[in-house]
Amino acid sequence: MQRPVCLLIWLFLLEAQAFEIPINGNSEFAEYSDLVELAPDKLPFVQENGRHQRSLPEESGEETDTVDPVTLYSYKVQSTITSRVATTTIQSKLVNNSPLPQSVVFDVQIPKGAFISNFTMTVNGMTFTSSIKEKTVGRALYSQARAKGKTAGWVRSRTLDMENFNTEVNIPPGAKVQFELHYQEVKWRKLGSYEHKIHLQPGKLAKHLEVNVWIIEPQGMRFLHVPDTFEGHFQGVPVISKGQQKAHVSFKPTVAQQRKCPNCTETAVNGELVVMYDVNREEKAGELEVFNGYFVHFFAPENLDPIPKNILFVIDVSGSMWGIKMKQTVEAMKTILDDLRTDDQFSVVDFNHNVRTWRNDLVSATKTQIADAKRYIEKIQPSGGTNINEALLRAIFILNEASNMGLLNPDSVSLIILVSDGDPTVGELKLSKIQKNVKQSIQDNISLFSLGIGFDVDYDFLKRLSNENRGIAQRIYGNQDTSSQLKKFYNQVSTPLLRNVQFNYPQASVTDVTQNNFHNYFGGSEIVVAGKFDPSKLTEVQSIITATSANTELVLETLSQMDDLEEFLSKDKHADPDFTKKLWAYLTINQLLAERSLAPTAAIKRKITKTILQMSLDHHIVTPLTAMVIENDAGDERMLADSPPQDHSCCSGALYYGTKVASGPIPSWANPSPTPMSAMLAVGAKPLESTPPTHLNQVENDPHFIIYLPKSKRNICFNIDSEPGKILSLVSDPESGIVVNGQLIGAKRAENGKLSTYFGKLGFYFQKEGMKIEISTETITLSSGSSTSRLSWSDTAHLGNSRVLISVKKEKSVTLTLNKELFFSVLLHRVWRKHPVNVDFLGIYAPPIDKFSPRVHGLLGQFMQEPAIHIFNERPGKEPGKPEASMEVKGHKLTVTRGLQKDYRTDIVFGTDVPCWFVHNSGKGFIDGHYKDYFVPQLYSFLKRP
């Protein structure tokens, strides 16, 4: 199963031919004389003639090193991250202070998946610049240079976690050389944070060593952390400054600080500088950033309950897994099994030339079952060959059978995680046939993730296998760290929060959208979608996201203005104004490369190839189809920078490989029927303006009720004068299983000896649907069984199921629809945050319809069955413009006053005046009993009637 090690090493060897650069004047570098005695390392600036001698008397026979032949004058790295798009420049300057020519290698490591965009080199005054060519054209230019006897170099990078960019030049005595490499990448969110790594390996002490990382995130930064990756040697050297939306990390060790020890001539700068951060997320619909004709959509919702998962672990136990690989895999699996949730189902399939199962069916992740599975795994003894085909088909069969028999939770997700270290040696050996078998057998609701351990496995095959079946592949290095790598990957997929996530951009002027349909969304990660739009036709971009959470269908809407970012970006010189364009190109090219590897016909593959090539040339980046030609102005010195072998997966580091689907409008189920505006029962209070008013009017702040009586076509009003914390029953219908209650909150302080109260929280309980909905001034929470979904008022969203629909209008209202015929509207009233008295509060509107049972009651519910009223003897009141009258209702004769109340459904700030007859003394005589009879103990309690 394993290939010869020598072959593996040979594949990673870097070819190089050194430039012979003629001398062209003396070095112009200043202040490097004090570096002459600094000892060199061998990487990344290796001198082939790095040792020279001084003459001694023949009898002594001694040879000694004198000075460092090549001095590293400066080593600078600059990274700017604008909305996850990172652009990095690595620059180094060296001086040959030797009397002999010196060969210098520029060898730096860049992140896997990054696109090289530019490389320049200045050698003794001669400048080499780069251009992007189609790969065959670039190689032809390189071959021509060699054929004509001109100097040519070959630069190749190797496919490891960090790829190497390598070139070599031969510089004459006294000459200077400067290298500068530019690359760009996208930061992918993993386990709740973004991680930016800069590999620092100057190889020797540098007169000037400086690293700067600027981060600009319009969403604002939630945290920023620079972990110690140099074993405490540079403690306190990184300087961090963080604002709300911007941050700067600098790393500038002095020459003394760079030394491994006080008298050492070796540098301690050899490793990775890591910056970790995350951004704020206020909206579940994500952050839609629009700029310069492109948009990017970042989607990472939180506060959602995990979706139960059905998971099959398929583990290679062939002979090649013997030793550290198997030991580390067992340790990882024991931890992973412990992390399963009680509502998960699982089983284990292990295979060599035979296929075995711990359980033939999925079982619940109870403590007993987990303990038994761990004992089974601990007893595994690797041996034999590798039958990947049958192992995968067995796992698929178990999941398919459970689904067909109705044994799976319909709201769950199904995952297969394959762990293998080699190609098949038993059973079906043809990789394309295995790929076809899996594709034909697997159901659309199953995602396949592949983990390839070491380099013996055909990683390209695993990528195609997973990408085609709604998953991804990842390489795991077979060493002492294998266990933590396996656990880290599992943690990334262990918490599915959404299924069937689709991004829709319904406007006709939105084009070239990247993959917008994803099978799952996992907690701690982020989905990114990008596209183009025509600025001359659109002033804003609309998005509609549909998805399924643990207990409900979900629709999220957002709208972004074109000029939202322009002013923000213009104020920061480090912000990249092309970040939207770069991110769109990065996603598009990577997704096209993955599609190209799966293309079913040669014609489709040629079409995709043409698109990738043109985009690579347009955006000046090195991809598997292009090469970078590096030459001087005269064209008589030339190198070729080639890309690594083609990576058939999408977006290195990304957790998702999706598909493209046509965008559509809001689903029909998420469009509630219009609520009659005239026939509503209302509870609310008059708000203050959202901004500081120039003058304040005296208003009634206690909850006021407006009861519309359709038969008599009259509005009757009353107030409830109670205390904060009390919960009032608004609607209680035990027969229909419907509860609506409201909890009172108080003002910040009393005025004129009276503390005003408001509704700060509303509870809706639909008993037959098993659904509870809590609406506060901060969040909207939907609970169904053990699952909970939360939205904030900053979202525009729809969520629900076949019977209950919740529609949230950003910072305005929530509409609840039951069985498409019963409606409740909740309005949010925001007040000026610094107001000394008032607070945010809620108003509720309910239609007086006959959809409730005769037993319905509550302060609103009792009027669903209209009482007979008779208003007569209208007369002047005690206050001008407020006449009084007598009202007979429910056997009582009351004195009522004509006045105006506010309906805020059409005007949330000022409201619409509604004329009504006001009943005094907290509605006494108009409501049944006393208002204190309507107190209930809990937010979802039914009203107990005497």
From Swiss-Prot:
GO terms for molecular function: hyaluronic acid binding; serine-type endopeptidase inhibitor activity. The modification Phosphoserine is found at S60, S466, S886. Residues 56-185 form the VIT domain. SMART domains: VIT, VWA. Residues 1-18 form the signal peptide. The modification Aspartate 1-(chondroitin 4-sulfate)-ester is found at D702. Heavy chains are linked to bikunin via chondroitin 4-sulfate esterified to the alpha-carboxyl of the C-terminal aspartate after propeptide cleavage. Glycans are attached at N118, N263, N445. I-alpha-I plasma protease inhibitors are assembled from one or two heavy chains (HC) and one light chain, bikunin. Inter-alpha-inhibitor (I-alpha-I) is composed of ITIH1/HC1, ITIH2/HC2 and bikunin. May act as a carrier of hyaluronan in serum or as a binding protein between hyaluronan and other matrix protein, including those on cell surfaces in tissues to regulate the localization, synthesis and degradation of hyaluronan which are essential to cells undergoing biological processes. Belongs to the ITIH family. This is Inter-alpha-trypsin inhibitor heavy chain H2. It comes from Mus musculus (Mouse). The lineage of its organism: Eukaryota, Metazoa, Chordata, Craniata, Vertebrata.
